[in-house]
């Protein structure tokens, strides 16, 4: 239970000194993540680890063929899943990126920037070993538009000294009556094995930090469970991949310091184009969702939310996996990705909004174009009914734009003589880009670049507000801009 106490700078200094003592963990190798921020609330996440960092000097995994992977998955061959990917005589703890969790207790301190004397301090709480040694705090009654500072402490158990501490911060959105310039970044599709800085992670993270965004959105495919090194066909291997990725310095530092919204897509929960009934090895589709929603990321009762960021901007974050049915069903009014409740919520909240600019953020395309062989998103022919239903609604709105992830190329699509615009942010590294040919520039394309990077969106408030969509390369350099 959170309790408010006055705590001075001397007290904070004392706790910091304690944390420097030679104590063997637990530590915060996976840092802090936050999620679902609105004007008055946010969710904070952390995990306790045995070591200060992951074992990035461990042994490499063995690559097996995709055919072998599929056989192991279909036959639920747990012994084979490990023995074919881990060298003989070794175990998972010997492998590159191993970052085991550990039991212990955590305590949260947070305060409005510049007001450490009014810090709110939580009780010491044990992390949950059944949820990968993680813990979450749901903070409420916060102040809109304020920047908060965070410090979390760790100790092995009650009565023992502090073993580690970690700093972080987050910014809450201003209320709907406050004019405010807002900038945010959107990314998609990057995993550990396709990072472009082997020592640190993905270069887009320091590049985005240079822009000083107010918040950040990851549209999903954060990690690929169905890619090698290793193929994660058990819960243990899924957790291994999450823990390894979030121990990378670039990722960890960025998440500690920025308000974030984490979405999911197919590869995060199992196999490519996953849906109910499409399990991956020993991990059911539903369990993959649960590990993402309840364990590895900040938790929210619904996986969709709309957030007002000041007078001129409102965003909609929609969920593309939890409420869908099977891809192979015949198209029609009952076939869905969004689900009936989420879809009606979107229509109702957009109609109720008076924001100057509205941005729908989705894990996968609605307009496209996409590849002909795909049948997993609203731009594909297998979902034409629901696509038309949503686009017919968007056509009637003013200044409502679609931003999406999933596709491994950057693009801007506009359907002439309509209000339909879609901005694909692209993959997080050049090595991850592909799936489309640069020369395949369609009539609806306003911009096309088969390279990695990210998207930034800037809303300038005032008497004549505007919104700017900028595609960046991995180093942060602008490669395309569209202003409305």
Protein language model annotation of sequence segments:
Residues 1-23:
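Bacterial Sec-dependent N-terminal signal peptides
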């Amino acid at each position: 239970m959170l309790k408010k106490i006055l705590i001075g700078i001397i007290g904070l200094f004392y706790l910091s000194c304690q944390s420097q003592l030679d104590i063997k963990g637990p530590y915060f190798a996976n840092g802090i993540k936050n999620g679902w921020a609105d004007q008055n609330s946010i969710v904070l996440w952390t995990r306790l680890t045995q070591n200060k960092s992951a074992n990035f000097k461990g042994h490499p995994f063995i690559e097996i063929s995709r055919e072998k992977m599929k056989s192991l998955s279909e036959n639920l061959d747990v012994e084979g899943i490990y023995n074919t990917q881990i060298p003989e005589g070794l175990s998972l703890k010997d492998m590159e990126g191993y970052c085991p969790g550990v039991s212990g207790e955590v305590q949260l301190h947070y305060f409005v920037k510049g007001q450490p004397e009014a810090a709110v301090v939580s009780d010491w709480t044990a992390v949950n070993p059944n949820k990968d040694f993680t813990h979450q705090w749901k903070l409420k009654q916060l102040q809109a538009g304020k920047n908060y500072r965070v410090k979390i402490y760790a100790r092995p158990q009650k009565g023992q000294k502090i073993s580690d501490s970690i700093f972080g911060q987050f910014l809450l959105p201003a209320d709907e009556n406050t004019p405010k310039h807002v900038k945010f970044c959107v990314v998609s599709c990057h995993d550990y094995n396709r990072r472009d800085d082997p020592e640190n992670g993905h270069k887009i993270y320091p590049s985005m930090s240079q822009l000083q965004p107010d918040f950040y959105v990851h549209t999903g495919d954060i990690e690929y469970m169905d890619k090698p090194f290793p193929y994660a066909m058990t819960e243990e291997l899924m957790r291994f991949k999450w823990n390894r990725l979030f121990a990378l310095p670039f990722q960890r530092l960025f998440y500690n310091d920025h308000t974030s919204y984490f979405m999911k897509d197919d590869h995060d929960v199992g196999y490519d184009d996953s849906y109910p009934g499409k399990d991956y090895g020993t991990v059911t589709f539903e369990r993959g969702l649960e590990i993402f929603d309840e364990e590895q990321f900040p938790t929210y009762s619904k996986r969709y939310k709309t957030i007002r960021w000041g007078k001129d901007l409102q965003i909609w974050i929609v969920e593309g996996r939890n409420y869908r049915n099977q891809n192979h069903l015949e198209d029609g009014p009952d076939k869905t990705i969004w689900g009936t409740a989420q879809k009606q919520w979107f229509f109702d909240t957009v109609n109720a909004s008076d924001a100057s600019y509205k941005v729908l953020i989705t894990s996968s395309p609605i307009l496209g174009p996409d590849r002909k062989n795909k049948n997993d998103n609203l731009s594909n022919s297998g979902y034409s009914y629901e696509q038309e239903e949503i686009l017919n609604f968007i056509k009637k709105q003013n200044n409502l734009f679609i931003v999406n992830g999933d596709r491994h190329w950057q693009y801007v699509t506009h359907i002439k003589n309509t209000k339909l615009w879609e901005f694909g942010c692209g993959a997080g590294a050049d090595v991850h880009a592909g799936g489309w040919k640069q020369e395949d520039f369609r009539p609806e394309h306003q911009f096309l670049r088969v390279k990695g990077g990210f998207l930034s969106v800037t809303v300038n408030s005032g008497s004549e507000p505007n919104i700017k969509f900028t595609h960046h390369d991995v180093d942060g350099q602008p490669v395309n801009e569209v202003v409305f």
